[in-house]
Amino acid sequence: MTSCAHPHCRSQRNMNTPQKSALVVSAHSADFVWRAGGAIALHAEQGYAMHVVCLSFGERGESAKLWRKGEMTEAKVKDARREEAMAAAEILGASVEFFDIGDYPMRADKDTLFRLADVYRRVQPEFVLSHSLKDPYNYDHPLAMHLAQEARIIAQAEGYKPGEKIVGAPPVYAFEPHQPEQCEWRPDTFLDITSVWDKKYAAIQCMAGQEHLWEYYTRVALQRGVQAKRNVGITSARNIVYAEGLQSVFPRVTENLA
């Protein structure tokens, strides 16, 4: 039996198809922009419901420019960072929520872990993005990844809140840290974000508290773009200019190696 190709029928099938989703676990409220803004915007354009969890606002360690203004309080910094992150998420096409568990140092208890597991259950992500497993310059980042992985495991457990729909085994990717060599991070996946670079850079510009990083992450995207182009072959017709690097945490299961 063949399916109807009429536009109305195709539209009806699309309405009956559940929307795919993905989850980004960001230690601080700007990390998802620098490191995964392209991935978020690209998949949002592909129809994914992209959801970001910011574990903290980065109010202590990631907001130097705001603190230097003087007469600043932690509450004011948090408010500014929240506004920046929400504006960036809107540009990228993502929803965002804030756990506000603090930074420098970041600490997480069992309630935080269960809260994130509940997000997994609610979002049912097709894939997950978070930080590198190591970062000697910022201990908040590996903690975020460990939380992301442990919450994933809990959300897979039948015995956690029995009766709820468990999550499957969404692939987990570590996005690029600030200094990859020291973090023992090596990309095994390049994502072509050329088509959404304008959105990513507009989101980057929302991060007024860390303006010194705007140019740096532009250079990172250009560098990864060159490497992505090299890995598809320099004779390829694909015009890759900007890319994001990712490191997969788990093996991928496939039926085709092409």
From Swiss-Prot:
Residues that bind Zn(2+): H28, D31, H141
Chemical reaction(s) catalysed: 2-hydroxy-4-oxobutane-1,2,4-tricarboxylate = 4-carboxy-2-hydroxy-cis,cis-muconate + H2O
Gene3D superfamilies given in the database record: LmbE-like
Obligatory cofactor(s): Zn(2+)
Thermal characteristics: Optimum temperature is 30 degrees Celsius.
Cofactor binding note: Binds 1 zinc ion per subunit.
Keywords tagged on the record: Aromatic hydrocarbons catabolism, Lyase, Metal-binding, Zinc
GO molecular function: 4-oxalmesaconate hydratase activity; hydrolase activity, acting on carbon-nitrogen (but not peptide) bonds, in linear amides; metal ion binding
Stored SUPFAM superfamilies: LmbE-like
Pfam families named in the record: PIG-L
The protein's Enzyme Commission number: 4.2.1.83
pH dependence remark: Optimum pH is 7.0.
GO BP annotation list: gallate catabolic process
Disruption phenotype: Lacks 4-oxalmesaconate hydratase activity.
PANTHER family cross-referenced by the UniProt entry: BLR3841 PROTEIN, N-ACETYLGLUCOSAMINYL-PHOSPHATIDYLINOSITOL DE-N-ACETYLASE-RELATED
Family per similarity comment: Belongs to the MshB deacetylase family.
Protein purpose: Catalyzes the conversion of oxalomesaconic acid enol (OMAenol) to 4-carboxy-4-hydroxy-2-oxoadipic acid (CHA). Mediates the third step of gallate degradation pathway.
Protein's UniProt name: 4-oxalmesaconate hydratase
Source organism of this protein record: Pseudomonas putida (strain ATCC 47054 / DSM 6125 / CFBP 8728 / NCIMB 11950 / KT2440)
Gene name per UniProt: galB
